[in-house]
Amino acid sequence: MTTARYRPTWDLALDPLVSCKLCLGEYPAEQMTTIAQCQCIFCTLCLKQYVELLIKEGLETAISCPDAACPKQGHLQENEIECMVAAEIMQRYKKLQFEREVLFDPCRTWCPASTCQAVCQLQDIGLQTPQLVQCKACDMEFCSACKARWHPGQGCPETMPITFLPGETSSAFKMEEGDAPIKRCPKCRVYIERDEGCAQMMCKNCKHAFCWYCLESLDDDFLLIHYDKGPCRNKLGHSRASVIWHRTQVVGIFAGFGLLLLVASPFLLLATPFVLCCKCKCSKGDDDPLPT
């Protein structure tokens, strides 16, 4: 008995084999899938695993062609995805797509109550100032800008650690802002929840790296020096040994590039005159008149 992926050699010899750009294997055409938008072709098994992995991890954008050098930068259509994944994975894909649509829709917003998460409609779309939004599911009234409870006559706070549920007051939450389980990305203002682990956070929406406790940017802090001083000292959530190992790796990478450049510099200096001479000879040969 033969599987759908492997067939006898005498059968394979009759069909032309197509190469998959993901696994670099060669398979018959019926075991390959072509993306309609860009016409890039991959083996069905690889493409299926690629799509399932993106959906399970929580895709941030449309599922693009796996080929990084795709000339058309194609994307998989919904009907193509539905043909290759299970029903429960497809259901999760549609849910993620809907959440992203609401996130970027100026007419809609999510109810900030953690037990509700209904979609609310903004009354006045053209209004530039924060407006009152009332959730029809839980009757919570909140600000359209900062998603906190409605605060008439007051400006929006810079950061909101958590949104209170209906019937609760601030006295029920004695935790400091740094200990809040839900915060907003300081760059794109998307809500992020942290259960435990590392305090170096990266927003899935805008890829901004920041400190969970003080919300300071860590985009350029490759060595995580931020956690060596100040109020966030020793709050990274990793052992000192793992931090030292991380820094050693980063320094090693930069040192390796520097050493490579240093070693290659003499060769580049020696090769430059030869390259210039060759170019001069070629240009001189082009200018010489043809013999008569």
UniProtKB/Swiss-Prot annotation:
The keyword Iron does not apply. Pfam families: IBR, IBR_1. It is found in: Cell membrane; Cytoplasmic vesicle membrane. The chain crosses the membrane at residues 250-270. Its EC number is 2.3.2.31. It comes from the Eukaryota. GO terms for biological process: pattern recognition receptor signaling pathway; protein K6-linked ubiquitination. SUPFAM superfamilies: RING/U-box. GO terms for cellular component: cytoplasmic vesicle membrane; endoplasmic reticulum membrane; Golgi apparatus; plasma membrane. Its main location: membrane. Residues 16-236 are annotated as: TRIAD supradomain. The keyword Lipid metabolism does not apply. A zinc finger (RING-type) spans 20-70, 185-214. Zn(2+) 1 binds at residues 20, 23, 43, 46. Zn(2+) 2 binds at residues 111, 116, 135, 138. It is a single-pass membrane protein. Gene3D superfamilies: 1.20.120.1750, Zinc/RING finger domain, C3HC4 (zinc finger) (3.30.40.10). Belongs to the RBR family. RNF144 subfamily. Members of the RBR family are atypical E3 ligases. They interact with the E2 conjugating enzyme UBE2L3 and function like HECT-type E3 enzymes: they bind E2s via the first RING domain, but require an obligate trans-thiolation step during the ubiquitin transfer, requiring a conserved cysteine residue in the second RING domain. This is E3 ubiquitin-protein ligase RNF144A. It comes from Mus musculus (Mouse). The lineage of its organism: Eukaryota, Metazoa, Chordata, Craniata, Vertebrata.
